[in-house]
Amino acid sequence: MSGKKRTASSSRWMQEHFDDHYVKLAQKRGFRSRAAFKIEEIQEKDKLIRPGMTVVDLGAAPGGWSQVAVKLAGDNGKVIACDILPMDPIVGVDFLQGDFREEKVLDALLTRVGDAKVDVVLSDMAPNMSGTGGVDQPRAMYLVELALDMCHQVLAPNGCFAVKVFQGEGFEEYMKSVREAFKTVKTRKPDSSRARSREVYLVATGYKL
């Protein structure tokens, strides 16, 4: 029993140390959340965002991804962000607070996008977790389906999509849907993502109309 206790204790310590490292690093670099490192790592590998691009950031609060996106898109770019939670203003980011699952919020978001096509859709959305897989997974899959639907409505030809997905029921079917819509789809597990988490990021490039 003592061995098991030590193992559990050291696992906890490692996790806390890991979390603390990224939290401190985020504070040091002025990021609002440790999630900023996830999109930074994806950007480093996949080069999704370039100067002058228009980016939609879904599930944006507290703003870590938007901070990275607006810096990459530059003065001539545009970042439109949405979250059900409030978010303190970020210079260069057009933020809409509302529940993305509601039609009126989607309509308001589409109005902000306007007639111009979007170059990149980012989604770090996740439901409030209950701890019950049979409840959480369908909720999570519903959100990523909505994000993919957003791509179909606003994404420019050859546009890009990066979305957080939780592995489990519905994952393979969703992966198939993304592959049908994009030329290339890669699965990423950023270093800053907790090892025990079922989250992965699908990075899709080359949107096919």
From Swiss-Prot:
- Record-level Gene Ontology MF annotations: rRNA (uridine-2'-O-)-methyltransferase activity
Name the EC number(s): 2.1.1.166
- Give me the residues that bind S-adenosyl-L-methionine, please: 63, 65, 83, 99, 124
Top-rank taxon: Bacteria
- Membrane spanning residue stretches: none
The family database entries (InterPro entries) matched by this protein are listed as: RNA_methyltr_RlmE (IPR050082), RNA_MeTrfase_FtsJ_dom (IPR002877), rRNA-MeTfrase_E (IPR015507), SAM-dependent_MTases_sf (IPR029063)
> What keywords is this UniProt entry annotated with?
Cytoplasm, Methyltransferase, rRNA processing, S-adenosyl-L-methionine, Transferase
Query: Catalyzes what?
Result: uridine(2552) in 23S rRNA + S-adenosyl-L-methionine = 2'-O-methyluridine(2552) in 23S rRNA + S-adenosyl-L-homocysteine + H(+)
Q: Which GO terms describe its cellular component?
A: cytoplasm
| Gene3D superfamilies found in the cross-reference section | Vaccinia Virus protein VP39
Active-site residues from the entry:
164
Which SUPFAM superfamilies does its entry note? S-adenosyl-L-methionine-dependent methyltransferases
Q: Which PANTHER family match?
A: RIBOSOMAL RNA METHYLTRANSFERASE, RRNA METHYLTRANSFERASE 2, MITOCHONDRIAL
Family of the protein in this entry? Belongs to the class I-like SAM-binding methyltransferase superfamily. RNA methyltransferase RlmE family.
Describe the task this protein carries out: Specifically methylates the uridine in position 2552 of 23S rRNA at the 2'-O position of the ribose in the fully assembled 50S ribosomal subunit.
> What is the protein name stated in its UniProt record?
Ribosomal RNA large subunit methyltransferase E
What is the organism of origin for this protein? Shewanella sediminis (strain HAW-EB3)
- Gene name? rlmE
